Amino acid sequence: MNVIGADPHVMYDEKSGYYYCYATSGDSDTGKYFYIYKSKDLVEWEKVGYALDTSINCWGKDWYWAPECYYNPNNEMYYLFYSARINDDLVEEHFENKNYYECAKIGVAVSKSPEGPFINICNKPIDYFPFDKDYLDVDQIYENIFDVRIKEEDLPKGIVGQYIGTIDVNLFFEDERIIMYFSRCCYKNARHDKVLNKFIEESHVCAVELNTEWWFDKDAKMMPTIKEKFINQNNLGTIHRRDGFINIINHSNQPQEWEDGHVNDYELSGGKSPNRRWFEGSTTFTKIINDKKHYFVLYSCNYYVNELYGVGIAYNNEPLGFFTKFKRNPIIKQNPIKSLYSTGHGCLVEKNGESYYVFHGRETKTSDRVIYVGKININSEEDVYVSDIKQCKLVSF
């Protein structure tokens, strides 16, 4: 049997000697979310159950996506990070617009065991209000932005600044720093493409640095907080809090053709779907190459049903700031000959001195997403490839 799930994150648990996989499980009638599996070899997996129990401190409405679990040696607790759309009564507080559609935020739950249950630390998401102070809100200028054809130099003046929804959280630990990577949602992020001469809604990979006090809380009751320099960094003179963030991956900084899987969706769907570009599902890590530390980000582009959906990689000499995309992206993509479709959104795992990428894919264009694993080979910033891709198997459930 296949290991069903999407957006997998794998953590090795030294206490038990198991690899634990946490994956998006879809909607729930029971208030429990995110599949848990465990394995000794990354290929054969046992089903454990569900990770998150929202019967206590529930702040999310739906869109429970992309769980990631981290073991904290300071208090011997396990921390589950995830994203969800917030309850209706919280939307205006976080976005200054009660009708904000993609109102996703990041939450944190804890457990004494990697097998859960994970309980939310509090009844609100992380205290973070990311705001793009430079964004021109064209939705308030044009009735339908996807019907507009306008040259870049003719863009009108308008309302500037917008809160952003956040999904696909990933933590990076280095020395005494904790950096939180995430994707800003496409909604309310329409960018004018001067080549295509039209608006495209885009998601971007972004980051913010966290304080570390919560990581040393012996009682595991403290929520993560962002560094003070980011708090209200993008305020435009209002009484509302507007926090900063750092861009990591987007389209305009270094365009690549494979990122354009959905830029004509509005026309092709007869106006039912927006034109979009997705940069999501990031995971950050380092490699020592020729005695030098290199920072890498793996990420996914496009929506998983599209034939161009795949995995890219980018590199930098520091963990913050724009990363340089690998010239031969994507490094994982669909392969109909091998019945491999919808390849994306995974995590890096180390095993016996080798690096592996655990990700989701599909056997057909219509089947459920299931878990795969492949060996990732990084010889330099210009020599990266994935080999020996295997479909994971469920051996106990």
Segment roles from a protein language model:
Residues 1-397:
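Carbohydrate-active catalytic/glycan-binding domains of CAZyme proteins
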